[in-house]
Amino acid sequence: MAEATERLYRVEYAKSGRASCKKCSESIPKDSLRMAIMVQSPMFDGKVPHWYHFSCFWKVGHSIRQPDTEVDGFSELRWDDQQKVKKTAEAGGVAGKGQHGGGGKAEKTLGDFAAEYAKSNRSTCKGCMEKIEKGQMRLSKKMLDPEKPQLGMIDRWYHPTCFVKNRDELGFRPEYSASQLKGFSLLSAEDKEALKKQLPAVKSEGKRKCDEVDGIDEVAKKKSKKGKDKESSKLEKALKAQNELVWNIKDELKKACSTNDLKELLIFNQQQVPSGESAILDRVADGMAFGALLPCKECSGQLVFKSDAYYCTGDVTAWTKCMVKTQNPSRKEWVTPKEFREISYLKKLKIKKQDRLFPPESSAPAPPAPPVSITSAPTAVNSSAPADKPLSNMKILTLGKLSQNKDEAKAMIEKLGGKLTGSANKASLCISTKKEVEKMSKKMEEVKAANVRVVCEDFLQDVSASAKSLQELLSAHSLSSWGAEVKVEPGEVVVPKGKSAAPSKKSKGAVKEEGVNKSEKRMKLTLKGGAAVDPDSGLEHSAHVLEKGGKVFSATLGLVDIVKGTNSYYKLQLLESDKESRYWIFRSWGRVGTVIGSNKLEQMPSKEDAVEHFMKLYEEKTGNAWHSKNFTKYPKKFYPLEIDYGQDEEAVKKLAVKPGTKSKLPKPVQELVGMIFDVESMKKALVEYEIDLQKMPLGKLSRRQIQAAYSILSEVQQAVSQGSSESQILDLSNRFYTLIPHDFGMKKPPLLNNTDSVQAKVEMLDNLLDIEVAYSLLRGGSDDSSKDPIDVNYEKLKTDIKVVDRDSEEAEVIRKYVKNTHATTHNAYDLEVIDIFKIEREGESQRYKPFRQLHNRRLLWHGSRTTNFAGILSQGLRIAPPEAPVTGYMFGKGIYFADMVSKSANYCHTSQGDPIGLILLGEVALGNMYELKHASHISKLPKGKHSVKGLGKTAPDPSASITLDGVEVPLGTGIPSGVNDTCLLYNEYIVYDIAQVNLKYLLKLKFNFKTSLW
């Protein structure tokens, strides 16, 4: 359904007497006015209300400026209660004595702002992150503690100057003054005067005087204002009358009709029956007062009144809710069935047909509430940190011998806002040396186990001086292959106000996300039979997943709703004891990539009962029978993910171990194979793409699922280019994220609504396909324990790999090609050739044979991530699958090459912490080239053309090219090509037939990043 703006607060009449107040712990009587703050549930992917008695709500310091826009359910209250909420909010929640001036009215004390002298030196200013000394004046804003919302609103302290700087963000309005602060009267006379000057009430006199100067008729203005006030008063009276009419109908219906009667009335008038007595009563009263609602024109769903409009509760597709919202829905006359006319109230009820009125939209609507949560958030980018304190709320561990001593390092870290820690488990970041990482001491093993990123010492210097983002600096100085995320300790949750409320693109919700360390631990699944037993069941060592009739009773389900902001999972397993006839149903649920969620283990009386219960739960969650061959997606129901928990996981572990002494392969080849099949690198690549390793661990990627995701991206590309509706874009985005689980923490999954996002996801799927190939190779094939794991993996590549002698002529030619064709604009690194391998893929030479006679054959570069090379060597360079959208590639789906080494090297995706990359040299049969200067989505080459050449402004000097065995090697230095009206800096070569490529060499390169990247 269309979702109303998410609001931080809620108000209603208690539906029962079961809820207890979060402040006084007393029960809240049924039908009494109660208020709540909405917080993220720790048990499931959604928000829950924390209820208070009306009076208790204000006592804990909740502050509301505009109840009509900030409080959900406000307009559904009785008129008198609406006024009660408004008046209490206007009084700042807590009415204070105030200060009297010149016989004027007493000022209202603001309940959520306070001033006092610090009672100790333990508090920290939330503006500058410096300590507030004991006895120093401090100001506070009450906010919800993200870790302990049950405590209600607590003080977040600031130095007075820091408070003044953040006045707008903290919601201290222009009309407020220092004298309205709680505790102001207890300050010294001197501090009162100083504070009054710092926090004056800003009056809007200037504009009036300016208007007079401009000759604006003040009399006319006053008349206009009077007219507006009269109009406003008239609307208010009408709203009051409307409210009283609706509540009169509700009161009379409660006396005269049973809940079943009300349901019958809704059914007779072709309205959906909601759950809950109060919701049923609301719908009937709305229909009687304004007419029966006609179905939504977009999806034929039911429209429902919610505060500021009628929202559709239907679904556009099985994946996406309808977005229709209107204040003028189509209606028909409400009809009372004959049998109900015996009820005296319904018999005499006559209501004049009218439209529902809505209060005018506020000129300064409340901003959407920030995510309020039970726990804190580790974030990849410390966006909330002050510019001069980039390491705010971060704990840093130092390891090994640094150029600075420990005290100097500590001083520098604290100056940047961080804190020193001695524990790997508590650390956000580790500062060490490359030597220490290679040594892999016991302490470094702890750092790796905790998945804490390691950076070099230069990071501290650059983070204080560079304008680059923290994330870029972390990547540039990284020394470890692990550590996908940098944790930041929780800061405050600020409810932004005014223009400054626009959320930062890099901001993340204040919820503790499940770090990769946690994910890694949960990935240690115990495999028995056909699937992995979830360790959260506590039965991984004593039970296995039941397999019956060739079907494994284990399911992982996903559900994404971008509008609502949910990114949910549901896991279901039927477990059978290893030793006796005992059975359990285990299920777990929550939000992907976070600790939010829970689980349940139920012991079943028998195998039959367990199977029946499993199938019932599966059908309840998906709408499909367990044994159904063709799955149908239903609205609001989960979708099954093809997670392949194969029995060959142990084989992967065996083959992924470090090589022994059995291998007969040359040492450089051994190292190359180890690099290509490095499982940690594969995991890191997935994490970079925000793939959720817990829901979709390595090796669980189904090729069919990836291809289905490509198809969705093709539809997205089409929808974007055709300017399709928001509903269609939403639908496709929901489907994509359900199919490929992403870890967004508490952020809403982003809409796939532009070509850039499509391109990024296409690149992600390209890499996933290659990782899937690599992992499939690791799992399959020989299990010969007499062979070294490296040799076993080498055989799976089906490629003859020979080390080229460093002193040979061909090695000299290749090194010259590397040196001469490094582009001047690619100056962040230099390339050093470590090893050169001559490669011959099985069957490729035979496949290439027909093209050996084609003219214009060149030796060209092709770079790719290390994780893609198992797929490249075992299957060759491939063209994107037909399901992939064309827009992901500049010149359509083909195999891309370059004549400038650094152009291809950029696709190796190396970093300062991971500087080794692999690059290919392939003989490419280009023939007649179709020359282009701008992007063109080629699906078929023009007649007589064999390839595409994207013309660049710079190209290797053609006079320096050499020819080896009829193949041109363009190893000249880069010179202007004479082509200026092109969008490319350097040449690109694309072939659309895989047989036109014969891979010749593989180079292992070291990227020597320059110390200053800016």
Curated annotation (Swiss-Prot):
Modification type N-acetylalanine: residues: 2
Binding site for Zn(2+) 1: 21, 24, 53, 56
Protein known as: Poly [ADP-ribose] polymerase 1
Positions where N6-(ADP-ribosyl)lysine occurs in the chain: 521
Family affiliation: Belongs to the ARTD/PARP family.
Site positions per UniProt: Cleavage: 214-215
SUPFAM superfamilies (UniProt xref): ADP-ribosylation, BRCT domain, Domain of poly(ADP-ribose) polymerase, Glucocorticoid receptor-like (DNA-binding domain), WGR domain-like
Residues found modified as ADP-ribosylserine: 500, 504, 507, 519
Zinc finger (PARP-type): 9-93, 113-203
Region (Zinc ribbon): 291-333
Compositionally biased tracts (Basic and acidic residues): 510-519
WGR domain mapped to chain residues: 542-638
Enzyme class: transferase
Residue numbers carrying PolyADP-ribosyl aspartic acid: 388
EC number: 2.4.2.30, 2.4.2.-
Lineage summary: Eukaryota, Metazoa, Chordata, Craniata, Vertebrata
PTM sites of type PolyADP-ribosyl glutamic acid: 408, 414, 436, 438, 445-446, 457, 485, 489, 492, 513-514, 520
Residue location of crosslink Glycyl lysine isopeptide (Lys-Gly) (interchain with G-Cter in SUMO1): 203, 487, 748
One Pfam family here: PARP
Any GO CC annotation of this UniProt entry: site of double-strand break
Location of Phosphothreonine modifications: 594
Region described as Disordered: spans on this chain: 357-387, 496-519
Any one GO BP annotation for this protein: protein autoprocessing
